[in-house]
From Swiss-Prot:
GO biological process: carbohydrate metabolic process; heparan sulfate proteoglycan biosynthetic process
Cystine crosslinks: none
Alphabetized InterPro entries for the sequence: 6-hairpin_glycosidase_sf, C5-epim_C, C5-epimerase
Organism: Methanocaldococcus jannaschii (strain ATCC 43067 / DSM 2661 / JAL-1 / JCM 10045 / NBRC 100440)
SUPFAM superfamilies: Six-hairpin glycosidases
GO molecular function list: heparosan-N-sulfate-glucuronate 5-epimerase activity
Keyword Lipid biosynthesis: no
Lineage of source species: Archaea, Methanobacteriati, Methanobacteriota, Methanomada group, Methanococci
Protein name: Uncharacterized protein MJ1128
Keyword Signal: yes
Keywords linked to the UniProt accession: Signal
């Protein structure tokens, strides 16, 4: 009986040692991360995994006689991702469990955006620029845009999303993608990028079109938001290209702003379409936003004028 118990103890210890050794060597062959399980999950995704998540889907209906229907757009995906990251930052100290739920969704949507980005290279001023850009997988007949069109507002939103993912995780991979995204604003629209040179009084100005084409409608609100988000990225990272693009964007806003003045109202684009109430309200907020950012009185002037 005593011999039996001794045997059982020795067997138990032997098995325990085997488990420890096996676990040590198997574990040593796997990447070790100090981050929380949510971040580990996205660093080690399992191929062919089906995620049961809600994707933001936009219903466009029929535009100019063309049925667009339901579409998953990079613009609305990045908007939803940003909301998740903001929730994560707000809750991570007060409610870590709930915060991780938002982090997981934000990272999932960010990874989706990365998977949908097109990586391209264009020659600009005898230099090759590699960039990523997001496209819309449907026609947009309102501005005669073919399937595969792109826009600066969407691009800047994806840029902001990538930076938030980097801020939340510290993963340099997201910052690297953000740097590729900013490069698209250095490449002319004609070469697949999001830079349009707009001429006024024989001078050249940078414009980042919300609806990119060789002859864009020059929508004001999208250009302002894109410029400010580019500047935000530049200020947070020190990216010299972003800071330069921001400076040029502000110069263009100030130059062309009077052309969008309809008296007591504002124009949506350079084609003379008056804003609806939603975009009129947005223009006023943007004037206040620009004034607070720059201290330039011209923005306060238009805020007060359009507010009356």
């Amino acid at each position: 009986m005593i011999l039996m118990k001794k045997f059982e103890i020795i067997l138990f210890l032997f098995i325990a040692v085997l488990i420890f050794v096996f676990g040590y060597f198997v574990g040593a062959s796997q990447p070790l991360y100090s981050e929380n399980p949510v971040i580990q999950y996205f660093k080690n995704p399992k191929p062919f995994t089906v995620e049961n998540v809600n994707m933001p889907v936009t219903y466009y209906g029929t535009i100019c006689g063309k049925y667009i229907g339901y579409q998953i757009t990079p613009h609305n995906v990045n908007e939803e991702a940003r909301k998740c990251f903001y929730k994560y930052f707000k809750l991570k100290d007060k409610n870590p469990k709930e915060a991780e739920r938002y982090l997981k969704r934000g990272l999932f949507l960010t990874e989706y955006l990365i998977s949908q980005a097109d990586k391209e290279t264009a020659e600009v001023d005898e230099k090759n620029i590699t960039f990523i850009v997001w496209r819309y997988n449907f026609e947009f007949p309102l501005y005669n845009l073919s399937k595969g069109w792109r826009g600066a507002l969407c691009q800047a939103g994806c840029l902001k999303t990538l930076y938030l993912a980097y801020e939340a995780t510290g993963d340099e991979r997201y910052l690297n993608y953000a740097n590729l995204a900013i490069n698209a604003f250095k490449v002319p629209v004609e070469k697949g990028g999001l830079l349009k040179i707009r001429i006024y009084k024989n001078k050249s100005y940078y414009w980042f079109p919300e609806y990119a084409s060789e002859n864009p409608p020059y929508v004001l609100n999208g250009f302002i938001t894109a410029t400010l988000w580019i500047g935000d990225f530049g200020n947070k990272t020190g990216n010299a290209d972003a800071l330069y693009l921001y400076k040029e964007g502000l110069k263009s806003i100030k130059t062309f702003l009077p052309m969008y003045d309809a008296g007591d109202w504002s124009y949506y684009d350079a084609l003379g379409h008056r804003c609806n109430k939603h975009y009129e309200h947005l223009h006023r907020l943007q004037m206040l936003w620009l004034y607070n950012k720059t201290g330039d009185e011209i923005y306060l002037k238009y805020y007060k004028k359009w507010r009356e």
